[in-house]
Amino acid sequence: MLSLLFFWGHQPGQAFSKSLKFTLDSKTFFKNLERKPVPVRAPFRIPSGETRTGTILKPAFQYNIKKGINIELGGLMDLPFGQDDGISEGEPVISLHIDYLPGWRFTAGTLNREHPLLDAIFDDDLEFTDLAEHGFQIQADTRKLRQDFWLDWELNETSTRREKFVLGNYTQWMPGNFMFDLQVLWVHFGGQNNSGGPAENNFTYALGMGYSFSKNRFKESREPYIKKWNSQKTGFTVHYINSHDRSAGTSDNFVTNKDSGLLFKLFTTHWDTDFYFRVWSGGSRHFLPRNGDPIYTNRDFEELGMEKTWWLDDDISIRGSYQISEHRDGTITHTELLSVQWHIDFTLSKNHSDTVPNQH
């Protein structure tokens, strides 16, 4: 990786345009979760149903230093509806992006947090509850490979608080109509000089394979590093998911929980709408992925779902989804989502240069 960056940074001069532009991204969402609370050992629990609605704004300035290198400075703001506080959360956006190979990107600073991990490992609700991640990231989206590796440093150690970081990886290889993937998420609490308690580790991984019965043809995405297929598809995936948690218990004793399960998914796309049937076999009070959807702690469920995205323009989309699940005890849960996304940008300045000076 470092050798590729070094080689890329010492290429002969080439034409480029330095430019500064302003961008604004907006996502207005309504998400309703109808669930029955289930007590699980703290800090894990299946929460009761709730409704989240609001707008997430991302205003930013982007400066293109040279071809393949740009800096992004801005902010992320959460504006929940129905609250008196206005902006409930704000995060800075400070990123350096280096596109060093076709389809490959290295990021330092604020990360792209739309990780393609399974919901059991990385809950998609975090999109609305945890606005930003900061650290380092390597992403790839090519014809046969999809990669997302990142380090998110969430908390620095103090005299009374443990440090916290999250290390994640998603690697998907797509030879022909087959798919193989490896997914890993490690959540660590620790440090050496604090009174916040002993070190804790939560490690979850998944091994998966799949097959599509129709030929998958890669299509350039409207959004960077998000895979889209230019054809209808029907197929299945199977994942083995394992969770290992070691947390502090009472009287400075550690409590270790380990469990695993199988996730089967049958999917098809018709009328530009995604349909799927998913079966989860496994899970228990000992299946405790710290950043995963807590519904997987409940043993065994079947789920039907559908999702559709309407593109009104290249920069305006509406997405709707619905899923309903039946659990082993007969409980029915369902989730509805409606979101509207739009993007605008305009150039503030542009300076064209015929060549980039060679570095000596």
Predicted regions and their residues:
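Outer-membrane beta-barrel "beta-signal"
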Residues: 332-360
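Signature for the C-terminal beta-barrel architecture of outer-membrane proteins
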Residues: 139-266
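Transmembrane beta-strand segments that form the barrel wall of outer-membrane beta-barrel proteins
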Residues: 26-28, 40-44, 69-81, 106-108, ...
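Outer membrane beta-barrel
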Residues: 62, 69-154, 278
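Outer-membrane beta-barrel channels and translocator barrels
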Residues: 64-68, 99-103, 142-145, 174-178, ...
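Outer membrane beta-barrel transmembrane domains
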Residues: 116-123, 249-257, 265-267, 271-321
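Residues on the lipid-exposed face of transmembrane beta-strands in outer-membrane beta-barrel proteins
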Residues: 57-63, 94-100, 136-140, 169-173, ...
